[in-house]
């Protein structure tokens, strides 16, 4: 934590802010202790259950296999943490039986090391087609003329290559992965809660450290240091000051903390692959004006409207409708027109900061 704080300070904090203030911050952050040492990562039994649920759903929907590229879904199913490049690394999940992992020959040991499920691993050399091992695997199982589900983030060149290798197969949208990932288990919820606890702890530490003249980068450095000290992996720190707080994702104009102005912080972290995404708003160095308090109270009440509207069996879009109706009665909008709610009411979260389902007009998922 100490090294993190100094590194960010050296990169972004003005010299006039560093000396006594940074030393005080260093001392304060040393008092923070990790709160994630006792967390339980997703284990083999949970991943086995994920595969079993996926295969059961595939059989019910007539999907013979799924293709998954590196990213959250690959980690979700297999534990493989990998990056995307022009060299294909992928997981193929059959409707029954053992999955296949495909990777470049020289990466096999790394894939073996990170693989958290029973799976066959096949490789391809630099001069070979990476789709040949997949085609051979599916042909051996009589699936080369089947329906292959393509996970929604798979890149086009991978789809195109698979299509060429399996001309008789039918490539379709994966109807399984999103549906399974949307339903969080108790273990997943516990990790998400811990990530939220880390972010809230970082907020509580950072808030009193904010001083006049600080920039968004300065405040972000404090949040990053606190998040790391508390045992989280920082994902993002969006700090909006003054007028920029009116922009959902900020402004490129220079900003600094000034008394009486709004500080809006939108920050999140990861704990064992699961994320938090929490915003907090305050007025620095002065009591809020009547207008600032009025708008803050209206937004807080809008959140309560959303909570009351979000019930089991209710379409997600109706939550957005309820909140938008409330704001319009106050004179905001209409619709997305500012001043008012210029974006959807909310989004899902899990291994990614934005996941289905969205709280947005027209969303029928219940």
Predicted regions and their residues:
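Active-site neighborhoods and metal-handling regions in enzymes and metal-associated proteins
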Residues: 4-366
């Amino acid at each position: 934590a100490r090294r993190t704080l100094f590194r960010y300070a050296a990169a972004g904090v003005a010299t006039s802010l560093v000396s006594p203030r940074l030393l005080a911050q260093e001392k304060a952050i040393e008092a923070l202790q990790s709160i994630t040492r006792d967390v339980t990562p997703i284990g083999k039994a949970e991943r086995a259950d994920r595969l079993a649920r996926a295969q059961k759903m595939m059989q019910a929907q007539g999907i013979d296999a799924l293709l998954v590229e590196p990213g959250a879904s690959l980690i979700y199913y297999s534990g493989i943490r990998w990056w995307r490049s022009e060299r294909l690394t992928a997981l193929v999940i059959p409707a029954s039986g053992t999955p296949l992992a495909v990777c470049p020959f020289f990466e096999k040991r790394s894939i073996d090391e990170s693989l958290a499920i029973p799976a066959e691993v096949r490789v391809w050399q630099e001069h070979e087609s990476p789709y040949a091992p997949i085609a051979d695997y599916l042909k051996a199982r009589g699936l080369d003329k089947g329906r292959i589900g393509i996970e929604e983030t798979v890149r086009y060149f991978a789809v195109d290559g698979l299509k060429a290798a399996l001309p008789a197969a039918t490539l379709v949208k994966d109807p399984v992965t999103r549906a399974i990932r949307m339903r969080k288990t108790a273990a997943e919820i516990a990790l998400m809660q811990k990530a939220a606890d880390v972010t809230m702890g970082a907020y509580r530490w950072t808030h009193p450290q904010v001083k006049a003249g600080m920039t968004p980068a300065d405040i972000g450095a404090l949040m990053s240091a606190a998040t790391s000290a508390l045992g989280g992996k920082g994902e993002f720190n969006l700090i909006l000051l003054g007028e920029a707080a009116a922009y959902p994702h900020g402004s490129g104009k220079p900003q600094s903390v000034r008394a009486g102005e709004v500080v809006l912080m939108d920050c999140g972290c990861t704990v064992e692959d699961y994320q938090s995404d929490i915003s907090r708003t305050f007025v620095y160095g002065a009591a809020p004006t009547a207008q600032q308090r009025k708008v803050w109270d209206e937004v807080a009440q809008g959140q309560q409207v959303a909570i009351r509207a979000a019930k089991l069996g209710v379409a997600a879009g109706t939550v957005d409708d309820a909140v938008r109706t409330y704001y319009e009665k106050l004179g905001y909008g209409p619709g997305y027109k500012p001043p008012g709610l210029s974006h959807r009411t909310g989004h899902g979260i899990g291994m990614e900061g934005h996941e289905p389902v969205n709280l947005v007009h027209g969303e029928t998922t219940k």
